[in-house]
Amino acid sequence: MFLHTIKQRDIFTLIIIFFVEITMGILGNGFIALVNIVDWIKRRRISSVDKILTTLALTRLIYAWSMLIFILLFILGPHLIMRSEILTSMGVIWVVNNHFSIWLATCLGVFYFLKIANFSNSLFLYLKWRVKKVVLMIIVVSLIFLILNIFSLEIYDHFSIDVYEGNMSYSLGDSTHFPRIFLFANSSKVFLITNSSQVFLPINSLFMLIPFTVSLVAFFMLIFSLWKHHKKMEVNAKGPRDASTTAHIKALQTGLSFLLLYAIYLLFIVIGILSHKFMGGKLILIFDHICAIVFPISHSFVLILGNSKLRRSTLSVLRFLRCRSKHIHIMDP
């Protein structure tokens, strides 16, 4: 076990950063969900892409609110987060929301790939014609990994931590493999408890790498499809920026942004687990916590910029706010 004392000033700064990130996450994902739901009510129908985007936004919205509740509990009642049921509940909420956040984003990439790419392969055409069923099947199969993930975490929790109710301390066994990182208060000091588990790391990495691999394959297949389409356009002596090419490029931009953010996220998960063994510094761990929230927030804003309807709605809101501010400025004596 590694125990690092962190100054109250550092914790205050960390909490402020978390609050800013969570606020941005609530605004961004709330905006995506609100725009799509309002459009759904008006049109009495919703596209498959909007279904995925709305579900993804609601999932990340729940995650942001759960993190906000956890921070408020940490500030207002630090003794509450020492209760085993609170820790277990927060852990399960984080795992479930993180799982659906990543897998729904993966489904979005697969959906774009099947709808936009052009291949004459019979298997691809079979999947392309049944893209909705493919996305649904991906979600169903991912539930198996979710159950295994939660089951593995519960096993490690039972063997790694014994929380003494009413006493703000942990009793950890000699062979502890505690896979999570928690903050808790004790008098005027705050400690960060963590343990690098060489057994947990490959298991957790496996669960995270599966959707990443699926997204990566879809991304490279989309690049290959664009290359084939570009060659075909050259043979036919047509302009390179037809509708299909534009659709390919937009999908690739969205996919590349997701993969880069996802790769950075995975990188800091590994660094956060291994940092004590090689560096023993608290800054890497704090940055790891921040990156865990930055990934879904950043990707949500990427989705807003990459979706024409969401982008138009954003510009409309910004124009309204600017006109509103000018009106208030004129009315102000």
Swiss-Prot record:
Going by the UniProt annotation, this protein carries glycans at N167, N186, N195
Q: Which residues lie on this side of the membrane: Extracellular?
A: 1-14, 82-90, 156-205, 275-283
Q: Which UniProt keywords apply?
A: G-protein coupled receptor, Glycoprotein, Membrane, Receptor, Sensory transduction, Taste, Transducer, Transmembrane, Transmembrane helix
Q: Which InterPro entries match?
A: TAS2R
Parts of the chain that traverse the membrane: 15-35, 61-81, 91-111, 135-155, 206-226, 254-274, 284-304
Record flagged with keyword Transmembrane: yes
Pfam families cross-referenced by the UniProt entry: TAS2R
Q: What is its main location?
A: membrane
According to the UniProt topology, which residue ranges lie Cytoplasmic? 36-60, 112-134, 227-253, 305-333
Query: What's any GO biological process attached to this entry?
Result: detection of chemical stimulus involved in sensory perception of bitter taste
GO terms of molecular function: bitter taste receptor activity; G protein-coupled receptor activity; taste receptor activity
Highest taxon of the lineage? Eukaryota
What name goes with this protein? Taste receptor type 2 member 110
